[in-house]
Amino acid sequence: LKYPIEHGIVTNWDDMEKIWHHTFYNELRVAPEEHPVLLTEAPLNPKANREKMTQIMFETFNCPAMYVAIQAVLSLYASGRTTGIVLDSGDGVTHTVPIYEGYALPHAILRLDLAGRDLTDYLMKILTERGYSFTTTVEREIVRDIKEKLCYVALDFEQEMATAASSSSLEKSYELPDGQVITIGNERFRCPEALYQPSFLGMEAVGIHETTFNSIMKCDVDIRKDLYANTVLSGGSTMYPGIADRMQKEITALAPSTMKIKIVAPPDGKYSVWIGGSILASLSTFHEMWISKQEYDESGPSIVHRKCF
């Protein structure tokens, strides 16, 4: 099993091209040469990568027009906002992206290389301590499913650990494909706790709450209150029950005492980038933002930096 995207950045273009081909022809069943294509990218995506994406869309797939948008900005649009800070955590990478009037502020974007795949690996490790063995890529998919179905974020980690130790109220059972039933207790909240305490994974980094706070502090003092009041969670690794309440508690502890803090956790958080893309593409003003095949032929791949920002 290979992953052409590492930490949110495409690293294997041949495989990525195969995935796009499969998406167009097998999943969407559309001819790419007949439709404009909106692609999304990670924050701080290298310039060469944006150019490569653009080149593949026009030269391999013959798209009539295309546009590249930053994922976090689309998530913010999906929440009905144009100003706010997005904590976007997917499978390979987590970013905090402050956005003002629709534009990401690159100097204040922070990246944390801790996301869904790391949490799945960690859950595999702590389930092994319980005597269950998960090692193969197939078994990793099972553990990912356990994670998505049973894990949650504790409001108070120490207190939750005490509860788990003194009673079986937090235990849940899960049936494996072979019919074996396993029981999982404090692992349910120990796994996503690593988002707040990366030291659990042996990482030096600060947690997602501090990363969000640090990102806000890199912004102009005049816009900070708009960011605190519009903190939007997005991506599959923000889908844990309890994550918004915990975030509210942690940011409140870090922020000035009078600050109004609002954490927005959309129920469809794992699709909010896609939803934001459909909003952007349906705006009446958007048609003049596309890069056309003609513009590409005249200017080459670097056109993407002039038209998509």
Curated annotation (Swiss-Prot):
It is an enzyme of class 3 (hydrolase). Its EC number is 3.6.4.-. InterPro entries: Actin, Actin/actin-like_CS, Actin_CS, ATPase_NBD. Keywords: ATP-binding, Cytoplasm, Cytoskeleton, Hydrolase, Nucleotide-binding. One of its GO terms (cellular component) is cytoskeleton. It comes from the Eukaryota. It catalyses: ATP + H2O = ADP + phosphate + H(+). Pfam families: Actin. The keyword Nucleotide-binding applies. SMART domains: ACTIN. One of its GO terms (molecular function) is ATP binding. It is found in: Cytoplasm, Cytoskeleton. Actins are highly conserved proteins that are involved in various types of cell motility and are ubiquitously expressed in all eukaryotic cells. PANTHER family: ACTIN. Belongs to the actin family. This is Actin-3. It comes from Echinococcus granulosus (Hydatid tapeworm).
